[in-house]
């Protein structure tokens, strides 16, 4: 994971960080950093409906930046994506304050995480996730008749990279 900006106050341990997950394990760390009540700022797409002077409507998807107060977090390890559901806290041209929305976090896309208190557990996870020397990988192949799984093992998770099935007569 790449730490783009660290804006955590040393006085009250509040503040924000801008992060860019770069691999599946970074998504796991991201999932463990975000908790309900945090604020998350990221780019997303929203369907915007506009009405013309004649009364006809036109809808289009627009890329917008939203800041959500996190209510729920879902992690899909197979896809390497995180869905964050929450309520908009910063009004913009297309989304009002209080509107519900879901942001999907993906590798190689920056996001800003704002916490009222970065405690020692979150600080350790942040430090660990950004430390390249801690990411030693091990590959494992699990075999049984007619089936093989190729897995990558890191210090925090196991990722299945391939499943090979072959019928044996």
Functional labels for PLM-detected ranges:
Residues 1-149, 153-169:
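Extended, charged alpha/beta regions that create polyanion-binding interfaces
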């Amino acid at each position: 994971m790449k730490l783009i900006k660290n804006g955590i106050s040393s006085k009250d341990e509040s503040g924000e960080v801008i992060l860019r997950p770069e691999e599946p394990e970074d998504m796991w760390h991201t999932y463990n950093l975000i908790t309900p009540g945090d604020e998350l700022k990221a780019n997303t797409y929203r369907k915007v409906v506009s009405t013309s002077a004649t009364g006809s409507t036109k809808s289009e998807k627009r890329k917008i930046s939203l800041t959500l107060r996190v209510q729920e977090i879902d992690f899909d390890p197979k896809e390497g994506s995180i869905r964050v559901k929450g309520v908009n806290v910063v009004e913009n041209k297309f989304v009002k304050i209080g509107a519900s929305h879901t942001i999907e976090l993906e590798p190689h896309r920056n996001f800003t995480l704002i916490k009222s208190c970065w405690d020692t557990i979150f600080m350790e996870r942040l430090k660990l996730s950004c430390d390249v020397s801690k990411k030693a990988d091990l590959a494992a192949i699990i075999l049984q008749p007619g089936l093989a799984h190729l897995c990558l093992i890191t210090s925090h998770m196991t990722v299945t990279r391939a499943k090979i099935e072959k019928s044996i007569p």
